[in-house]
UniProtKB/Swiss-Prot annotation:
It comes from Thermococcus onnurineus (strain NA1). Residues 1-13 have a biased composition (Basic and acidic residues). It is found in: Cytoplasm. GO terms for molecular function: ribonuclease P activity; RNA binding. This is Ribonuclease P protein component 1.
Length: 125
């Protein structure tokens, strides 16, 4: 019960009011707010989550050819969602990122480290 006995609206702004009005939405992947600003020069210091990635070369032959969107990034791994979800170690692969109509190749060893730590390395140089 609400203050002074008044019933308030039991919903968040922009949401359906009644229980049966929920809209089933398709799954989507957050691809970053400024993903169009990614270039070959700044990809090392940019957020990789949401970019489309493909593995070009790897020390393990089963990793070659995996492609999908980057879902998560840790210090030493990338989580890529394509046909299924793969956790890929950064240090053993060469990746190709698709940004708009450009393709950017980068060695995974250059990506080792958390994104915020890679940015610090840039400013220390």
């Amino acid at each position: 019960m609400r203050r002074n006995g008044k019933e308030g609206k039991d919903r968040a702004p922009g949401r359906p009011q009644r229980k049966g009005q929920e809209v089933a939405s398709r799954p989507w992947i957050f691809r970053g707010l400024d993903r169009n600003r990614v270039t070959a020069k700044n990809i090392l210091w940019h957020e990789l989550i949401g970019l489309k990635a493909k593995i070009i070369r790897a020390s393990h032959p089963e990793l070659v050819g995996i492609e999908g969107y980057v879902l998560d990034e840790t210090r030493n791994t990338l989580t890529i969602c394509g046909e299924r979800v793969w956790v890929i170690p950064k240090d053993v692969v060469e990746l190709e990122f698709e940004v708009g109509d450009k393709r950017i190749r980068i060695n995974g060893r250059e990506l080792i480290g958390r994104p915020e730590m890679r940015l610090k390395k840039r400013w220390r140089r």
